[in-house]
Amino acid sequence: KLSGGGQLNDSGSHLLDIIMWIAGEPVVEVSAFSDHFDTEVDINTAVKMKFQRGGLGTLSVVGDAPRWWEEIMIVGSVGQLLYRNGELTHITSIEGASYQVAFPQTSANPVANFIECIRNPKAVNHTPAVCGLRTIELTEAAWRSAAAGGKVVKVPRTA
């Protein structure tokens, strides 16, 4: 009741935002299933996504897992990147050859940037509002899909 919308909204929204940021494009269609366990909000949700240029993605948000676990896998033409609980690995062959990858150093500090944007109307917002809007559009489309038993739902583009 106090969650603000369930696990997909609370935790999954951050992952959805990251996935769209990594892909560099929005999701256009979604299919989702959720389990509420007799509560008002989703506890576990499985989401299938189709990106604007045809790429596919999946997301599982598990609110009743015995421990925290976070994993993102991106498969491409020259291998895959696996982010697992804070570590990034590049897997380079089907045999599993891999090496740890250092995260790129950035000068961006989202909190400092947010404060600067409040103080200075001419400051550049490095996290534009459209990122949040796309995440909300996708989250709400996933909720509609789950309510319809997993029916494929088009993700609206309001901006």
Question: How should each PLM-predicted stretch be described?
Answer:
Residues 15-16, 108-115, 136-139:
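A general structural signal for well-ordered alpha-helical segments in protein cores
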Residues 9, 13, 105-108, 133:
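Electropositive phosphate-/nucleotide-binding environments in soluble metabolic enzymes
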Residues 34-44, 51-112, 125, 157:
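NAD(P)-dinucleotide binding in Rossmann-like oxidoreductases
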Residues 52, 116-159:
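C-terminal helix-rich "cap/oligomerization" subdomain common to oxidoreductases
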Residues 1-33, 38, 149:
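Predominantly a Rossmann-like dinucleotide-binding segment in NAD(P)-dependent oxidoreductases
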Residues 26-27, 31, 55, 122-123:
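Secondary-structure boundary/capping signal
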